[in-house]
Amino acid sequence: MNLLTLQQMKERGEKIAVLTSYDASFAALSDKAGVDVLLVGDSLGMTMQGHANTLAVSLRDMEYHTRCVANGTQHAFIVTDMPFGSFQKTPEQAFENAVLLMAAGAQMVKVEGGAIMLETVRFLVERGIPVCGHLGLTPQSVHQFGGYRVQARDEAAARQLLDDAKALAAAGAGMLVLEMVPAALAAAVSQAVHIPVIGIGAGKYCDGQVLVLQDMLGIYAGKSPRFVRNFMQGAGSIEQAICDYVAAVKAQTFPGIEHTFE
């Protein structure tokens, strides 16, 4: 799997199945089950380290887990989150840190933010580092948002998000994640940009879907997010649960209306 293949999948309407991964064993299972993209997410701060958010995750953490995932992967495309504080200062800072993640096995790095990140995205892409953007709910800004809330529900915010998506694509971003935005807006973004758009809590009309591995396996304390489906129920094994997730994404039976925000 590579960026060109993912682009071709969008063009022919084949949905892209993305799942987070943090270690070699689960990466190998996901790879075998047909997951197209493995996201080494800074969500590991919550799922693996027990923090309340992603802000404490370090660059060294992301390097380590990227290396683990790469060691267990043969086919899937590997995207690694750039953690909080590792890319916001200057494009040069972002490049130096992205190089470390690429050396650890990432094939693309993901950065959160809209128009403010355009110079950095351009800088990285011009120097050979593929970049995935992330709009909507950007977890590294959780305190600014006042919690994990649906974004871009009013007309002005929706217009800004659409403009940001177009600008990121024009700056050279090769993929885009949309998190917790209304389904109609996500559909409009997917149609407006030429790059694959991956949704999480963004409805079924994105070019692909991503979930946190632990969430889709039902491993969470308290109430699960609305956009999550527990694929472990009735699956019998973790591998089968992942296979069922991939199949549901490809068949567009996940996400359903019950997982979607309007």
UniProtKB/Swiss-Prot annotation:
What does the UniProt entry say about where the protein is found? Cytoplasm
Q: What is the lineage of its organism?
A: Bacteria, Pseudomonadati, Pseudomonadota, Betaproteobacteria, Nitrosomonadales
What does the record list as GO biological process?
A: pantothenate biosynthetic process
Q: Name one GO cellular component term.
A: cytoplasm
Q: What name goes with this protein?
A: 3-methyl-2-oxobutanoate hydroxymethyltransferase
Q: What is its EC number?
A: 2.1.2.11
Q: Where the protein is mainly located, per its record?
A: cytoplasm
- Pfam families annotated for this entry? Pantoate_transf (PF02548)
Fill in the subunit field for this protein.
Homodecamer; pentamer of dimers.
UniProt keywords, alphabetically: Cytoplasm, Magnesium, Metal-binding, Pantothenate biosynthesis, Transferase
Q: Which cofactor does it need?
A: Mg(2+)
| Record organism | Methylobacillus flagellatus (strain ATCC 51484 / DSM 6875 / VKM B-1610 / KT)
